[in-house]
């Protein structure tokens, strides 16, 4: 079931609402993020373990020096889900931003109820909020109300 959240809305996970992510004072736990993704490997894949991630690791010497540090520091920074074999890419990307202490999302497809439920479960595990544009909280009730409007 597709949920009506406009594609220009940014879904993120943070420990507090925000207008500007630079103003967030309560940061997410990177260790708990890694723990959660490792527990849920049936759905998520670390970018490092994807074909692209393995290629980058195996060819790190061919990458310009100025870009190597960013690649090496991004270990466990992105989790991927729902590989589209026809298109050749993952359609759901979660990015942990250590500097901001938040997780942002990228969807290459319509957001469905199952996506919101996965994100809400992750947010709850991290003792955090699932947010639209940093302001609107998505909880179980929000999802149910969206479903009723369909």
Regions found by a protein language model. Name each.
Residues 1-150:
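Acidic (Asp/Glu-rich) sequence patches and key acidic residues
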């Amino acid at each position: 079931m597709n949920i009506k959240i406009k594609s220009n809305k940014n879904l993120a996970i943070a420990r507090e609402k925000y207008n500007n992510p630079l103003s967030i004072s309560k940061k997410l736990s990177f260790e708990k993020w890694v723990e959660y993704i490792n527990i849920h490997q049936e759905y998520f894949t670390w970018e490092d373990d994807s074909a692209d991630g393995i290629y980058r690791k195996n060819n790190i010497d061919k990458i310009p020096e100025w870009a190597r540090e960013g690649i090496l520091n991004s270990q466990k920074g992105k989790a991927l889900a729902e590989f589209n074999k026809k298109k050749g890419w993952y359609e759901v990307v979660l990015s942990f931003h250590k500097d901001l202490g938040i997780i942002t999302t990228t969807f290459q497809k319509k957001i469905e109820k199952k996506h919101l439920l996965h994100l809400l479960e992750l947010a709850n595990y991290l003792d955090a909020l699932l947010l639209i544009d940093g302001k609107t909280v998505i909880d179980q009730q929000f999802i149910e109300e969206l479903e009723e409007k369909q």
